[in-house]
From Swiss-Prot:
Alphabetic keyword roster: Ribonucleoprotein, Ribosomal protein, RNA-binding, rRNA-binding, tRNA-binding
Cellular compartments per GO CC: small ribosomal subunit
Any one GO molecular-function label of the UniProt entry: tRNA binding
Subunit structure: Part of the 30S ribosomal subunit. Contacts proteins S9 and S11.
Keyword rRNA-binding: yes
Protein name: Small ribosomal subunit protein uS7
Function: One of the primary rRNA binding proteins, it binds directly to 16S rRNA where it nucleates assembly of the head domain of the 30S subunit. Is located at the subunit interface close to the decoding center, probably blocks exit of the E-site tRNA.
Similarity comment text for this entry: Belongs to the universal ribosomal protein uS7 family.
Keyword rRNA-binding: yes
């Protein structure tokens, strides 16, 4: 363990747009090699495409609902007890849950882009719409985490 003081978390600066801090965090996750302006263009284009494909919903509300649908509630943590490693189900903190959801959406869009011949913007739009409808790769990742936690419920008495 480090003897230094605890590291304070730096707040994410919002651009003052309608999406707020969550959208700013999403742009930071989408960003690659420090190209933030490109990431902002990709995200805003994907939200506009999602808004045009859906009926009556704004892009930001689609994004917020998609993220809340992908956020995991439970996950497993490894703990060594008496020479045996157990997978212990624990509840996920709010900030970790949000960041996992954002990462899963971006990861699903990137893998989909490699499989298909579409642009990253359209793949991101499709993944957001699928997460909005509780389908898609990102939702499968959430369900996989929950299934692992359910399978190891017997070890929940080894809480951290």
């Amino acid at each position: 363990m480090s003897r230094r003081r605890r590291v304070s978390r730096r707040p994410v600066v919002s651009d003052g747009g309608p999406g707020g801090v969550l959208l700013a965090r999403f742009i930071n996750v989408v960003m690659s090699r420090g190209k933030k302006a490109l990431a902002e263009r990709i995200v805003s284009g994907a939200l506009k495409m999602a808004e045009s494909k859906s009926t009556g919903e704004t892009g930001v509300s689609i994004f917020n609902t998609a993220v809340s649908n992908v956020m995991p509630r439970m996950e497993v943590r490894s703990r060594r007890v008496g020479g045996v490693t157990y997978q212990i189900p624990v509840e996920v903190r709010e900030d970790r849950s949000t960041s996992l959801a954002l990462r899963w959406i971006v990861k699903a869009a990137r893998t989909n882009r490699k499989r298909t011949n579409k642009t990253y913007m359209s793949c991101l739009c499709n993944e957001l719409l699928e997460a909005y409808n509780k389908r898609g790769s990102a939702c499968k990742m959430k369900e996989e985490k929950f299934r692992m936690a359910e399978a190891n419920k017997a070890f929940s008495h080894f809480r951290f």
